[in-house]
């Protein structure tokens, strides 16, 4: 951090007061960010706590198997949506960057990525955008399949012709149907141990 410069005594008294006040405010703000704010603080566990958490997760199965299950669920949802809406098609996103991101999964709150991750199903891209009525049909199918995972808390940020979304979360899972220029389905799972950790 850059040290505050001394205030010249030649400044009028009121200017010195203002300058000192501003330095005090900025030091508090900057100091708070650099000294107190640590995004990893909530994720830190002692060695014993980490071992206990890992042991408690072993019976959930592996990250890799969970990702396969979620991708199978994404396929079921996409097939159901296509069957329910005439002319609708779908495919898994073939963008290599998206595919790599999906394979890598998301970070867990308390364990590092070399131990556990949150699986992400292969991203679904629908062949056509949904009308308002068709979006309701698709969202209802997502709702039904998400409930099987214990995800029942629904939300939506926007519902207009240019942008629609439906999100349902719970039990560590998130299902998101999103439509802007095209319609997509993304599913993220709870935290699972990597297979290599289970094998130890």
Which role fits each region the language model picked out?
Residues 4-20:
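Bacterial N-terminal signal peptides that target proteins for export
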Residues 29-32:
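C-terminal motif of bacterial Sec signal peptides marking the signal peptidase cleavage site
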Residues 34-36:
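Bacterial signal peptide processing site
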Residues 46-55, 69-120:
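Compositionally biased P/S/T/G-rich terminal and signal peptide-adjacent segments
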Residues 57-68, 124-133:
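Second-shell loop/turn segments in exported
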Residues 89-105, 154-174:
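Ser/Thr-rich, low-complexity intrinsically disordered terminal regions
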Residues 111-161:
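Long, charged/polar, surface-exposed segments that mediate recognition or autoinhibition
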Residues 162-200:
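Extracellularly exposed regions in secreted/surface proteins, prominently low-complexity, repeat-rich
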